[in-house]
């Protein structure tokens, strides 16, 4: 059996500024794959902590890192890239992620074009509608992380 290689990565479940009064999460549609909606996420650079990577990735991807950190998933969680996907990260079989639950402080600060755009559109959607919008190969990870934050009373 071959040893799989996973790219270290952070991901953010971003609650709207109205949280906890409204339970809506931020998702964005990838610019390179039409219809592929997901949470913001990105690689951890060498020497960077997951928290540092989170702030950098949010600034790069959504134009703001003005967030309040609510909780962190306690373990790394991995997923494999689908076999039919062109591997942007061909040296890796998938990604291992550290998830953060955060609240966005100001929705009007979102700017998908602040850096090199990775997303074409974004929306805040109710948690119950989330999995219908997400690419299938990420759904199990999303289910697991959402269930954890629900059990802990955050969602």
From Swiss-Prot:
The keyword Hydrolase is assigned to this record: yes
Motif Nudix box in this chain: 42-63
GO BP annotations listed: mRNA catabolic process
SUPFAM superfamilies, per database record: Nudix (SSF55811)
Cofactors named for this entry: a divalent metal cation
Taxonomic superkingdom: Bacteria
Signal peptide segment: none
Residue ranges of the TM segments: none
GO CC terms: cytoplasm
NCBIfam families reported for this sequence: PRK00714.1-3, PRK00714.1-5
Similarity remark: Belongs to the Nudix hydrolase family. RppH subfamily.
Function summary: Accelerates the degradation of transcripts by removing pyrophosphate from the 5'-end of triphosphorylated RNA, leading to a more labile monophosphorylated state that can stimulate subsequent ribonuclease cleavage.
Protein name: RNA pyrophosphohydrolase
């Amino acid at each position: 059996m071959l040893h799989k290689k996973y790219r270290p990565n952070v991901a953010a479940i971003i609650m709207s500024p109205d949280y906890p009064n409204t339970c809506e999460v931020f998702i964005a549609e990838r610019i390179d794959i039409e219809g592929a909606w997901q949470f913001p996420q990105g690689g951890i650079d060498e020497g960077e902590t997951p928290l540092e990577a989170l702030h950098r990735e949010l600034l790069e991807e959504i134009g703001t890192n003005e967030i309040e950190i609510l909780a962190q998933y306690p373990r790394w969680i991995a997923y494999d890239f689908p076999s039919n996907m062109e591997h942007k990260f061909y040296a890796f079989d998938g990604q291992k992620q550290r998830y953060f639950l955060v609240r966005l402080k100001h929705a009007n600060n979102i700017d998908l074009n602040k850096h090199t755009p990775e997303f074409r559109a974004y929306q805040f959607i109710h948690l119950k509608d989330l999995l219908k919008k997400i690419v299938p190969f990420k759904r199990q990870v999303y289910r697991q992380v959402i269930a954890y934050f629900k059990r802990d009373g955050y969602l």
